[in-house]
């Protein structure tokens, strides 16, 4: 079916299909309890996000504990936990007595890196915590403060600690606000000492993935992997692309990362807002082609922080991110501090179902096969062939037996028009597979039996039963299965078409 035929035959009834796009929700004070987490999971939450820009270790440990408690209360599908790093941000200092100072247009003042002003800022002089700012910026350049609420033009680089600037609009100078230098290559380290401690905390407490903020180069990813160490070798690194450097170096970053987040908030400040649309589509397409999961984030249902219903533009934004190819969509303040967190997750889930119905799966599959460099690995060849078999046989599901989670990721790359049932003995693989579009993970807890054929049959039957529970398969339905010829990772080479 062509894309046009697909669109003209859309079934626009919400809830008429099973959602395949995963939902990430940031947990804050209003949602950090087991009962609310259960409600969020029932509404569609798959991955819990902890924002390490805020909160103590005690607080974040409570989020982890409550997430795990919610699984005891409501087993369902496994829940994944993500740690979002603060990252190498640039921020203003503290104003005197923590007062907000009004700034009129054309107001001239000083930006300084002199530490004596770090806690003594006012409307005449503002401390900035990036020591090299005078080396990387020049007269005429623009500096944004507080997510672009205030704009300043650099009038003069006075000395190695001082900039003279002019306000381009009215606003307020406040404490600890973010500073952006659009179009400027900054040389901040990939990780602050706080970030390193946060990563070690995450490894110790069993997080499944890291959302790495402000990634600029491939070396940044390698630095994070080094800090995670041997104990954290299975933690997935998802890079957040939120500046021009990250966009420019994306191809090299993509080679070494486990996944990508298009973080449109800071990205929309660093580059012209209209360009974010094209960058989003480009980064998602490149991630899809590489078989790496991609998340679309920031302000997706922002109005639902305070309103029970979204704007129509927000619904379209969520839907179009899914049509672009996003594996996951993310909520931030909507679930962290919003008045309607469960409504927000429900709205996102319902929107995802409708958007997925608008996808022309077969043309997408053909595009992916044609654009993927050859030869592919044995595992990817089997994965692509399984998806082809789904289209040929009109199969209702793909059952994947996997140890490492690689095979379901590659099946997801080719976007079958049916769910992917992952059966694994590895709880971690089950949890991080929520990153992959269409994967429904289940942990098979029985010990392996000595006869390999019997063990494979037991796991496939388990997958069939789980698919029946979710209404994916029924008696007489065709399904495709993928398994290996022996135990362990890297041996998926067998494809089978069967009937329930």
From Swiss-Prot:
The keyword Ubl conjugation applies. Conjugated to URM1, a ubiquitin-like protein, in response to oxidative stresses. The attachment of URM1 to lysine residues exclusively depends on the presence of a peroxidatic cysteine in the target protein, with low specificity for the particular residue, motif, or structural context at which urmylation can occur. The URM1-conjugation reaction is mechanistically and directly coupled to the process of cysteine persulfidation, transfering the sulfur atom of the URM1 thiocarboxyl group to redox-active cysteine residues in the target protein if it is exposed to oxidative conditions. Persulfidated on specific redox-active cysteine residues. Persulfidation (also called protein S-sulfhydration) may provide a molecular mechanism that enables cells to protect vulnerable cysteine residues from reactive oxygen species (ROS) under stress conditions. K(+) binds at residues 51, 53, 84-85. The modification N-acetylserine is found at residue 2. There is a cross-link at residues 204, 255, 446 (Glycyl lysine isopeptide (Lys-Gly) (interchain with G-Cter in ubiquitin)). Keywords: Acetylation, Allosteric enzyme, ATP-binding, Glycolysis, Isopeptide bond, Kinase, Magnesium, Manganese, Metal-binding, Nucleotide-binding, Phosphoprotein, Potassium, Pyruvate, Transferase, Ubl conjugation. The modification Phosphothreonine is found at residues 31, 184, 478. SUPFAM superfamilies: Phosphoenolpyruvate/pyruvate domain, PK beta-barrel domain-like, PK C-terminal domain-like. Its cofactor is Mg(2+); K(+). CDD domains: Pyruvate_Kinase (cd00288). ATP binds at residues 51-54, 91, 177. GO terms for cellular component: cytoplasm; plasma membrane. One of its GO terms (molecular function) is pyruvate kinase activity. One of its GO terms (biological process) is glycolytic process. Homotetramer. It comes from Saccharomyces cerevisiae (strain ATCC 204508 / S288c) (Baker's yeast). Beta-D-fructose 1,6-bisphosphate binds at residues 402-407, 452, 459, 484. NCBIfam families: PRK05826.1, PRK06354.1, pyruv_kin. This is Pyruvate kinase 1. Substrate binds at residues 49, 240, 265-266, 298. The modification Cysteine persulfide is found at residue 418. It comes from the Eukaryota. The record marks 240 as: Transition state stabilizer.
């Amino acid at each position: 079916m062509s894309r046009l035929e697909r669109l003209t035959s859309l079934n626009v009834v919400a809830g008429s299909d099973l959602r395949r796009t995963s939902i990430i929700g940031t947990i804050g004070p209003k949602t950090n309890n087991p009962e609310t987490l259960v409600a969020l999971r029932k509404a569609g939450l798959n991955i819990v996000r902890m924002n390490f820009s805020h909160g103590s270790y005690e607080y974040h440990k409570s989020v982890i504990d409550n997430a795990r408690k919610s699984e005891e209360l409501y087993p369902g599908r496994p829940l994944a936990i993500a740690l979002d790093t603060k990252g190498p941000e640039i921020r203003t200092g503290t104003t005197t007595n923590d007062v907000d100072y009004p700034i009129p247009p054309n107001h001239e003042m000083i930006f300084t890196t002199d530490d004596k002003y770090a806690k003594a800022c006012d409307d005449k002089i503002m401390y900035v915590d990036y020591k090299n700012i005078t080396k990387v910026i020049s007269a005429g350049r623009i500096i944004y403060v507080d997510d672009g609420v205030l704009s300043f033009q650099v009038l003069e680089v006075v000395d190695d600690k001082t900039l003279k600037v002019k306000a381009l609009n009215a606003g307020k100078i406040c404490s600890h606000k973010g500073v952006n230098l659009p179009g400027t290559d900054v040389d901040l380290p990939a990780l602050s000492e706080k970030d390193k401690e946060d990563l070690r905390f995450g490894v110790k407490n069993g997080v499944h993935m890291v959302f790495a903020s402000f990634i600029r180069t491939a070396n940044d990813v390698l630095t994070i992997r080094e800090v995670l160490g041997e104990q954290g070798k299975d933690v997935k690194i998802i890079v957040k692309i939120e500046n021009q450097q990250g966009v420019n170096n994306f191809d090299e970053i993509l080679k070494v990362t486990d996944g990508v987040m298009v973080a449109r908030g800071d990205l929309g400040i660093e580059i012209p807002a209209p360009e974010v649309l094209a960058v989003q589509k480009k980064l998602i397409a490149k991630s899809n082609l590489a078989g790496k999961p991609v998340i679309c984030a920031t302000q997706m249902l922002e109005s639902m922080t305070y309103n029970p219903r979204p704007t129509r533009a927000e619904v379209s934004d969520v839907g179009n991110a899914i049509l672009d190819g996003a594996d996951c969509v993310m909520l931030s303040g909507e679930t962290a501090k919003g008045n309607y967190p469960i409504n927000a997750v429900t709205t996102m889930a319902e929107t995802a179902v409708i958007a997925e119905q608008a996808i022309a799966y077969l043309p997408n599959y053909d595009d992916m096969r044609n654009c993927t460099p050859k030869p592919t690995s044995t595992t990817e060849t089997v994965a692509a062939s399984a998806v082809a078999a789904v289209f040929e046989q009109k199969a209702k599901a793909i059952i994947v037996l996997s140890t490492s989670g690689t095979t379901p990721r590659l099946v997801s790359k080719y976007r079958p028009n049916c769910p992917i049932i992952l059966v694994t003995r590895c709880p971690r693989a089950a949890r991080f597979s929520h990153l992959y579009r269409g994967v429904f993970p289940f942990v098979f807890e029985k010990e392996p039996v000595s006869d390999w054929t019997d063990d494979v049959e037991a796991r496939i039957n388990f997958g069939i039963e789980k698919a029946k529970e979710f209404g994916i398969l029924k008696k007489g339905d065709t399904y495709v299965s993928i398994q290996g010829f022996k135990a362990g990772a890297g041996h998926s080479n067998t494809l089978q078409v069967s009937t329930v």
